[in-house]
Amino acid sequence: MSGPAADAAYTRPMADPRLDLHSLLLCDHAITAQDGKVSAIGLFSQINVSRLPTTYGRLFIVAVLEADPGEHQVTLQVVSPDGRPLLQRPPQMKLNVPPNATTANIVAELKGLQLKELGRHRIELRAGDRVLGSTPFLVSLIWQGRQAAKA
């Protein structure tokens, strides 16, 4: 084989390594044991606030991925109900999946999340421009005594 077709065969980019999201959880705390097992404590999908804007002190994000061995770059982003990214500097993580492994876990702590509106938000996990998956969470206003908190 010779000519342009042969040249194209040698310069064609290789397929991206496999990186598939299996689970994406929000929780109060997460622990990675010495053997690699992850414990997620206090799973939730709703954040109750008494007023807006507010700062949510701390939460953990746990992701379980199926991945080819090697290095992978992923980014977490919080997205508002109208689709705006909330994190100006979203956490970027490097995963090193060892040979013979097929899965990888991420445990990320997020402190001081600024919430400015009610409704369905989501956490997205991305590899470059590709959204691997997301999980929703609802921001709701709670009542305090006889008065509704002012939003």
Predicted regions and their residues:
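Contiguous segments within soluble domain cores/interaction surfaces
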Residues: 4-6, 12-118, 122-151
